[in-house]
Amino acid sequence: MIVRMQHLDLVCVASDREATLEKLRALGAVHLDLAAAGGAAVTAAKGELDDAEKAVRLIRKARGKDFADEVRPCSVADVLALDDDRATLVAEKERLEREIKTYEPYGDFDPVLAKKLLDRGIDLADELPAKLPAMRLGKMREKLARVVNRIAVDDAKTARADEQAILAKYPALRDKMAFEQAKELMSEQGAVAVVSGWIPVSRVSGLTSSARDCGWGLLLRDPAEGETPPTLIEPPKFVRPVKVLFEGLGIAPAYDEADVSVPFMCYFSLFFAMLVGDGGYGAIILALTLFGWRKHLRASSKAQGKGQVVVVRSWLVLMTVFSLATIAWGALSNTWFGAGLPWCADWPTVKWLGDPSYKNMMFLCFTIGVSHLMFARIWNGISAINDRRCLGQFAWAGILFFMYWITNTIVGIFTGGIPVWLYVVFGVSFVTVFLQSKGIEKGMLFLNVMSTLGDVISYVRLFAVGLASVKVAENFNNMALSIFSCTDLIWVKPLLAVGMILVLLIGHGLNFAMAGLSILVHAVRLNTLEFSNHKGISWAGYAFRPFKTAKE
């Protein structure tokens, strides 16, 4: 569900504003619009955080992949100073390289001696450049070598800087910036200071108790028309990890919209499995996830913020669910790294999904699609059951079912034509929607009805992308086998085996990466566009982020 919010105005004595903010932060229940805060103190605090992040990037860049030296304490300022020195040296290096390239054709001559000869009137126009260098070529090369060596020394010092010590300062720096932002939001009006924000209804009692103890004044009210409270989603426990997926995608339903966490999680898992389409890939994802679980369980006992632990654990739960769903799909379709297991070939699901005409797979995709979209419309209807508008939502479900039948008829899955009763369902549904439409909605009704056909057909992407993934894997398997079997010479076989393994690794690696990309494109789209359009989810909200310390 989406938690109800109340708007609050908190009043305190102006001289106690910092202490008030400290207690408000300790409470960890109030959302403040920190992004709207500015000012010199905020800029300075943000600059400190940016400097720390830049220092970490510089250290990682200097280390590369094979760093194994002992780290040494080094402040952020020291790392940035090394970078500034390096930038100056790089500019000097580039200048010297340009000069060497310019004067190299003239050889290693002494510019002082050349000037003396020119001053005596000796014509050396063909042998000397128009402008004499400041030093001879050999000296330039020596200086360039010294500059290159100093750059290497700076890089080595940067690489040995203690990255973890800087990372450990991140929470405190973030807290400092958030606190300065909160101070800027807290306006002073004479002897009092006022700050406004949002608080979940369930946390109001804790705030009022603190207000009594601290002598604050509180004004609490429900959101006014036109206000946009933050969205705090509290889904059922078994799908709670989906919240990190929403955060990762940067989406949140608006405050007055529905919480679609349960259908999003269920259908996204199904889409993930069908788009990857290979149980072998699912096994790899599961193995990587189990490795992640092992590292997480070891690391969670160390000094780490509770919020960070929850985020990592939620992602691991999600990947466990997605990988198991993919393995299950691989078992149902008998697809393992683009090949099938002989002893599974006669399973009913394998035969049904493996129909050479692909009609069964398309039928499954269209059925999943119409169930997804009809679920959205029926949910809307049930939510508005005490309002006559619910009839319009149920009517849209009828239109979707009619389009589903048409889609299956177009591709030859249903061969008996469209039954008369379905025309009646469509007619009644269309008239119901028409009568409930107003203004421009009536003018757009025909296009909206036709777009439902496109929405249902859109789910065929689950079949098309999944099939493409399987075919790519099959082709790389065949390519690898053809390389290994191209000759019967025994002494060549080891080399051919290496080539076969390389082809398999590269081919399946690329296919695995493309499967990940297809999830970001297609699985996300079907949930956030097709389904959300029918459910009425705009994803125009912003997440509830309470003012609290970064370690919480």
Predicted regions and their residues:
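Long, charged N-terminal accessory/stalk domains
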Residues: M1-F264, G292, R313-M319
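Conserved, carboxylate-rich catalytic/transport cores that coordinate ions
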Residues: M1-Q6, E18-L32, S202-E552
